[in-house]
A protein has these predicted regions:
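Bacterial N-terminal signal peptides
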Residues: 7-15
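Catalytic cores of secreted or luminal carbohydrate-active enzymes
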Residues: 332
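Ordered core of a single globular domain
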Residues: 318-321, 339
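Positively charged n-region of N-terminal signal peptides that target proteins for export
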Residues: 1-5
């Protein structure tokens, strides 16, 4: 099955690279978009939902209100208790000397059209961006950015101050990516996933796209500037009982490819360097690895049978490992031709 979004992105980039060979420049940047957690609460009945008649909370700033970061993607009434890892905005800008495009991904559940248009309208003319794509990873373990997951079914969980800051963060990431533009060479790969970490389609008809698609940008000396990875899975493997903000499987893939695969402080596999950008692919209804779907952690050599951070790590690192192995085995296609898109 073809991945339409990624095919269009590759087509556009390759068109630039072919027509203006030798002039390709790329810049990556990333920064945290993690909201501040102010008030603390205790989930007395352990249902991952805040009930003021049962659960306890501390008014840290003394304003008499429960200042929650409402988590998106699953049930209402799910305020964050802490931060597992930072959620990020990751940007890439690609310039062939004639055209310039920008892509920014944010570890959020979704972004409304009006919000995206406001970002495009705020882009300064001197950035010379011909097109900007703003993408949400569809993260189910981050803040509500669409108004569907607040303190009740009919109450928004969106914090307007956070959304204003998010807009600025996305623009700052783009600006930094432009500042980081440098000459680049591009290679690409279509990579099968490890069958020990299978993706499941939870609704009929059962149609699964199991491939990872990757674009790797490198310097003339061979060092990695950044990698753009596309894979179709719901970013939700910590699941609905999780009360810590996290970038989930997307974050583990990014850190694994860029920094290496770590368990605690032990480096088990070297990464490729640079910055990694995740684009969520075909996740329809409904590509995931459910809480009862077992996967195998090849680094810990054990089967994980429950949802949680360990499962997100195992799946994300498995994807990262596949990309790293493909690169180390010289199976990325250098300076790919447009005809490669037909496969």
């Amino acid at each position: 099955m073809k991945n339409t979004l990624f095919t269009l992105i590759i087509f556009g980039i390759l068109s630039l690279a072919r027509v203006h060979a030798g002039e390709l420049q790329v810049g990556f940047a990333q920064l945290s978009i993690t909201p501040e957690i102010i008030d603390q609460w205790v989930d007395i009945d352990n249902d991952a939902q805040f009930n003021p008649d049962i659960d306890l909370w501390t008014d840290v700033n003394g304003n008499g209100e429960f200042d929650a970061v409402w988590m998106a993607g699953f049930q209402n009434q799910r305020p964050a208790q802490g931060i597992k890892d930072n959620i990020m905005a990751v940007a890439v800008v690609i310039d062939d000397g004639k055209n310039r495009i920008g892509i920014v991904t944010a570890d959020t559940v979704g972004l409304m059209r009006k919000f995206v248009l406001s970002i495009r309208e705020a882009v300064p003319p001197e950035w010379n961006l011909d097109y900007l794509m703003v993408h949400a990873t569809h993260n189910h373990e981050g803040p509500d950015t669409q108004g569907l997951w607040g303190p009740s079914f009919f109450s928004s969980g969106v914090n307007p101050d956070y959304m204003q800051q998010l807009q600025q963060n996305i623009l700052d990431a783009l600006s930094a990516a432009i500042d980081n533009l440098e000459p680049a060479q591009m290679s690409m790969a279509r990579i099968p996933t490890n069958p020990l970490t299978p993706i499941k389609d939870k609704r009929k008809p059962i149609v699964v796209d199991e491939d990872i698609r990757a674009l790797l940008f490198s310097r003339p000396d061979g060092s990695t500037i950044g990698t753009l990875v596309n894979f179709g899975i719901h970013v939700e493997l910590a699941w609905d009982k999780n009360l810590e903000l996290t970038s989930d499987v997307a974050g583990y893939l990014r850190s694994g490819i860029s920094n290496g695969i770590y368990y605690d402080v032990a480096l088990l596999k070297a990464g490729l360097g640079g910055t990694t950008l995740w684009l969520t692919g075909n996740i329809g209804g409904l590509m995931t690895s459910g809480p009862d779907d077992p996967i195998y952690d090849s680094f810990l050599k054990k089967t994980i049978t429950e949802a949680g951070h360990s499962k997100a790590r195992a799946f994300g690192y498995s994807l990262a490992n596949s990309v790293i192995d493909t690169f180390n085995e010289n199976n990325f296609i250098p300076s790919p031709d447009l005809n490669n898109l037909s496969s």
